[in-house]
């Protein structure tokens, strides 16, 4: 019985070796006669190639090429400490304390410049912004202007140049312009600013709910803090990680330096 198994094994081994040799030849010669390659050899070869191709495709998927492409598109937030400048009208009284808490929590330095009753015209005809940019060297700027221009007639014509001047002074510094917290319909200040700034640089506050102070105009401190939170949440979705502003545990803070300017007569 053992001899029978050994003979059968030798026969199978010889046959396999024979077919292997045949598979490497385009033609076969037996006793000087040239024969075509057997179909079975071609089919076996095709099957082997197909199987190898499928295996290579699976390996390619496992390399994580698709995952690498997704990683390239992910937003990477700049975690370096920044100098932040926020300037504008009296709305900063509510916005600055909450922004200061964010700045402190994330290792940034905040400079706040409040110019009471100021407008785009006041800032656009002054050199103050250029002076503060030169002095504080901000890496990021927040603008809060427009509340004192809610009802200016023909604002698109009369204030356009001033908005453009402010943006020119800001230059290449990343910024967000926070629109006024409308308590009534405006005559076009929001549209004017929106028209002049690139997409993702203007936060439209109009339409939000605000709890108002006794003057019925300014948001309460608590409501202004939520307003600032809304701005920063919006930034996370619309800006490409220009500055880290993770939410602080403290409700408010104090700017590293605050400058107040009185209304222009």
How does the language model describe each region?
Residues 1-2, 36-39, 66, 96, ...:
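Serine/threonine-rich low-complexity intrinsically disordered regions
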Residues 1-83, 236-265:
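N-terminal secretory targeting modules
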Residues 3-9, 124-248, 259:
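Alpha-helical cap/lid subdomain in secreted, periplasmic
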